[in-house]
Regions:
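A catalytic-pocket lid/entrance helix-loop region that shapes and gates access to the active site
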Residues: 219-221, 226-341
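Cap/lid segment of the alpha/beta-hydrolase catalytic domain
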Residues: 119-199, 245-246, 408-426, 431-434, ...
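Glycine-rich nucleophile elbow surrounding the catalytic serine of serine-hydrolase chemistry
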Residues: 209-219
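Histidine-bearing beta->alpha loop at or near hydrolase active sites
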Residues: 487-501, 533-534
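Catalytic-loop region of hydrolases
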Residues: 25-111, 124-129, 134-136, 284-288, ...
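C-terminal motif of bacterial Sec signal peptides marking the signal peptidase cleavage site
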Residues: 18-21
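Alpha/beta-hydrolase fold nucleophile elbow
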Residues: 200-211
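Short beta-strand/loop motif that positions the catalytic acidic residue
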Residues: 454-456
């Protein structure tokens, strides 16, 4: 492990800095790159010229630099650090700046970590927080000594927060988000500021993100492989345009008359799938461990729940304990692929969602994370225009996307656009796919010795785990299984939804796993994930796809050691 380093601060350095600052025009701001380390206070006002940034900008500046005292305790402890805030100016004067934060610990481990965003971005990630699905019993990245940074991807969200797509009316802002240009700009500025603070560049640089942040991780290592030693991508929205179109098909299905199931009906569907499929992995524990078999055999039209038919009598909507034919039809649409044969990115379909056994928003569950699950799933209201604030997350997302990124008409009826046959909008959607759907060529990253960890919950109804499988399978077809496993791993987690789950709320020390692979050549095998909500403290193996966890027939059902990863 690299030695921990504290910035040098002798009086001679202060004198040299003063000479450096006075060496040019009185009106010229000081450069971020200096020969000796800067104090936190001296970081304020530093600038980075445009020619030091790998993509076009008009330069960057530090708007604030504040020393933050230590706080917290145990794994959640945050050491003393310099919190730097700044802006990267656009080329287009009408475009928004990229805002970023950079946490620089006083005692540095000589490594850097970039955090990805979420949804449509628009806010800066918490640079003193954890990685996606990070462990609760291990130090935070800042606590490990990392210099941690992230940006809002080049626009500032309004009241809709991560669902605000209005930035798409500006081409530069849209490109910063879609193609990941903001990632490169932010990274280059951060590296120079880290060098200014410590007098050297990082020995190692990693990227971690989930959802949109997972897509950003994959984009970063694909477009700029030389910049990164390793990356962690949780539930990545990798084929962004495909994910949006598949999600929009789901939204349109739920918008059909009588198709949206209320929370009680969603709970009935969940119970029916669990009662049908739970034991497929060898133990009935509330987790569907063999999701593929469940997908193959479960049919809501014929399934039972608590011994009674899940389908309402005659298919009519007769109450909260059953699903009508309209609701069953919508669920089956969500389960099936969306055909997309017109995209210039080369993607041809969205594979559908593992809806059978997924928590799509169960309001009787009183856990700390359930409000997040409900918000990210079907929420409280059916999709309709104008889109309700409590509509499904994906419905608000796709409504915004279509209005501001595709048609650029805020008054457009988004539900009228058929994602499989978009008519006049096909060319625009196809064009957007060329930047939003992350490329699959990771040969440059593999050649430079980079390492990639991917993971996805099998009950994610926002970003489909089937899409991550498709990405992995494409990589296998391009590089061969042996070539891919030389630098990448993909794990699946039964019971885990998108970023949160009351069934199995997965945590994993992915950062240590990545560090050990990159820095110690410790090749990762099966991993252990710990539940913090469903049964707090229970563990399961994280099986490398295509394996799944099967109970061995004896032993503690809440211990990973009682399960084997099998094909």
């Amino acid at each position: 492990m690299p030695n921990r380093t504290a910035p040098a601060t002798p009086s001679l350095i202060s004198l040299l800095l003063l000479v450096t600052a006075c060496g040019g025009s009185d009106d010229a701001p000081p450069s971020a790159v200096v020969a000796v380390p800067l104090s936190c206070a001296e970081m304020a006002g530093r600038t980075v010229p445009a020619d030091q940034i790998g993509l076009p900008t008009t330069g960057a500046r530090v708007t604030a630099a504040v020393t933050v005292a230590p706080s917290g305790s145990g794994a959640a402890a945050r050491p003393e650090h310099c919190l730097v805030s700044g802006e990267i100016a656009p080329v287009d004067p009408t475009a928004p700046s990229i805002r970023f934060n950079l946490a620089l610990p006083t005692v540095w481990n000589q490594k850097a970590l970039m955090l990805g965003g979420g949804g449509l971005d628009g806010t800066v990630p918490n640079v003193v927080g954890n990685v996606s699905a990070g462990p609760t019993d291990q130090p935070l990245p800042i606590g490990r000594g990392y210099a941690v940074f992230g940006s809002d991807s080049g626009h500032q969200a309004g009241p809709l927060a991560s669902l605000d797509a209005s930035f798409g009316l500006n081409d530069e802002a849209l490109h910063n988000y879609n193609s990941g240009d903001a990632l490169k700009k932010t990274r280059d500025v951060a590296m120079l500021l880290i060098q200014a603070r410590y007098g050297q560049k990082p020995v190692r640089s990693y990227f971690s993100g989930g959802s949109t942040g997972g897509r950003e991780a994959l984009t970063a290592i694909q477009r700029w492989p030389a910049d990164w030693d390793g990356a962690i991508a949780w539930y990545p929205a990798r084929a962004g345009m495909v994910s949006i179109l598949g999600g929009h098909r789901m939204s349109r299905a739920l918008a059909q008359p009588g198709a949206y199931p209320n929370a009680a009906k969603r709970e009935a569907l969940f119970k029916s799938a669990v009662q049908t499929c739970d034991a497929f992995d060898g133990v009935s524990d509330g987790i569907i461990g063999h999701q593929d078999r469940c997908n193959a055999v479960f049919d809501p039209s014929t399934a039972l729940v608590d011994g009674a038919p899940l389908r309402c009598p005659g298919g009519a909507d007769t109450g909260d304990t059953c699903l009508s034919d309209a609701q069953i039809t919508a669920m089956k649409v969500i389960n099936t692929p969306t055909n997309l044969n017109y995209l210039a990115s080369g993607e041809t379909q969205h594979p559908g969602y593992n809806i059978w056994g997924a928590d799509t928003g169960i309001y009787t569950w009183n856990t700390p994370v359930q409000p997040t699950v409900n918000f990210l799933a079907f929420n409280r209201s059916a999709p309709v225009l104008p889109m309700p604030a409590d509509a499904p997350y994906i419905s608000i997302y796709t409504d915004q996307w279509i209005k501001y990124h595709v048609t650029r008409d805020p008054g457009y009826n988004s539900l009228s656009l058929d994602p499989e046959n978009p008519g006049a909008w096909a060319s625009r959607i196809s064009f957007l796919s060329t930047t939003l759907d992350a490329k699959t060529d990771l040969s440059g990253f593999a050649a430079r010795g980079g390492r990639l960890l991917m993971a996805h919950g099998l009950n994610d109804v926002l970003v489909s785990s089937r899409s991550t499988r498709a990405y992995y399978n494409t990589l296998v077809s391009q590089m061969g299984l042996q070539g891919l496993r030389g630098f990448a791993r993909y794990y699946e987690v039964p019971g885990y939804n998108h970023a949160a789950s009351s069934v199995f709320n997965a945590t994993w020390d992915s950062l240590t796993t990545l560090e050990n692979w990159v820095e110690k050549a410790t090749v990762p095998g099966e991993q252990i994930t710990r539940d913090t909500v469903g049964v707090p403290g229970r563990t399961r193996p994280m099986c490398e796809y295509p394996k799944w966890p099967q109970y061995k027939g004896s032993g503690d059902v809440n211990a990973a050691a009682s399960f084997a990863c099998v094909n």
